[in-house]
Amino acid sequence: MTEVSDRTETRFRRTPGVEARAGKFPGPSLIPSLNAIQARRGWLPREELEELARSARRPRYEIEGLISFYPHFRTEPPTKVSLHVCHDLACFLRDGEARLAELRERYADDADVEVVEVSCLGRCDIAPAVAVNERPAPVSEADVLVQGARESDLGQAAPRTRAEPWANDPYASGSGVGERYAVLRALLAGELDAERIIATLKDSGLRGMGGAGFPTGQKWDLVRRTEPGSVKYAVCNADESEPGTFKDRQILATQPHLVLEGLLIGMAAVGAEEGWIFIRHEYAPEEHVLRAEIEALRAAGVVGADACGSGRRLEVDVFVSPGGYILGEETALLECMEGHRGEPRNKPPFPGTYGLHGRPTLINSVETLADVPVILQRGAQWWADQGAGESVGWKFFAVSGHVERPDVYLVPMGTTVRQLIALAGGVTGGAAVGAVQPGGASSNFIGPDQLDLPLDFDTAVKAGTMLGSGALVVLAEGTDLLAAATNVLRFFRNESCGKCVPCRVGSTKAHELLREVLESGATALGDARRQRILQLEEVMRKTSICGLGQVALGPVVSVLNLGGSTGGGLQAPKSDGASGQPVR
């Protein structure tokens, strides 16, 4: 404890503007210990928490503060069967509310079964989705799984795989650790150096694929140049929790080797010895895939105290999130890893200079890291040539909502909305497109007149939306757009960490206003309510600490714009000519 405390005090002393954080308790994070207790007992009994407080020498109120913040933790024994039902956009569009009502009625008098509404489970491809004792499934399988859970442990679900490998993978299908990790081996053997790797990433134009779009090579260069020779860390952000987003889950299940190689290359390039994959707890099948791959790497000597015989130490592990969409924000993620409540930090400083435990920290998304070994093997020019038109590289998209084949699709960056919907089999039942949310819940809705919009970072922004998390949600013509946007806003309201007033209060007030309109059966929002929404959106966008509050009302405003200046036309507009025809 003394060593950790001394290091923590030094950290606050040398870093401007963070003295207020000195009151936070130093020492190892208690999150993994709490996760372990709940995995063993099914909840967090008082005697276990008292023992943890004694053994870790931490005050009980600190532990209670963690438990009250994170939604995964339970302080009461669960029922024999926990039936979690997703209520967010992709499931909402597939009659999720009706299925939820049916399940509640069916099990209302069953003492063994608890039906709980939850935020997005990351299974939008099987919407409406449920999780029975944490085992994910489509709602059509709920009753069978409930019966199975009454009788025995359901066991772990298998991760979803593909019959054919993704086209981006440079390694032969079925190859093992010995044939993979070629770029990492070359780097550790001295055949490549960090400067060349970073230069190649800069030349390629690779940008962060988690939503921010920050140039990857520039980020790596910043972390590498910050405090050379000091302790540094690296984190893969796999806390994919935004409604409509499930592409990272598929990448982790099918290409764990590319994600881990990208992370390890990043660690070696910036000078970090320790790295983690921070994964949401709902992704247990993918967590097991990652742990198996890490064990294979350790057995082969690729990671450890003497990685690939280079004399360099590279250690990597998995950190399981205790829940909460806010943890996708990089500084909230770091707060969680340090064992605090996952509340975003004020920035600057940024993680590249002041990250985990106050040290320079490289943070990249799953897809970004998976792209790194591909680019370094095939070259920056090859990557640039893969895009459509002026765009660069490949892009994974998760497509859900009113489409025939919800799934993950790998396409050239710059593929149009229309083309992506066509890959997903077109709109369900041959209907016309009414609206599209092209970049996940954070992105603004676009109308059927924008189906030929190329999906890349800059073009999307110019069109008034964003590429975001790579989640394209399709709404058929006739869908109640205000209800859909209100559903999105409810998600942000529920997931707000509550730290800043604009986000906490603004999202609640706006949701109450919209809910009143929907419950009244009104066909128009009206000028007064519209102006109130616009005022709240401006205040939240300009004054919220993190991206959640800044974007929470954007989708609602975009729907109002699609419906006209008075807020009328609350249903998806009729198609106008060829641009709104069904895509098959």
Give the role of each language-model region.
Residues 1-584:
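Feature of Fe-S/electron-transfer and energy-metabolism proteins
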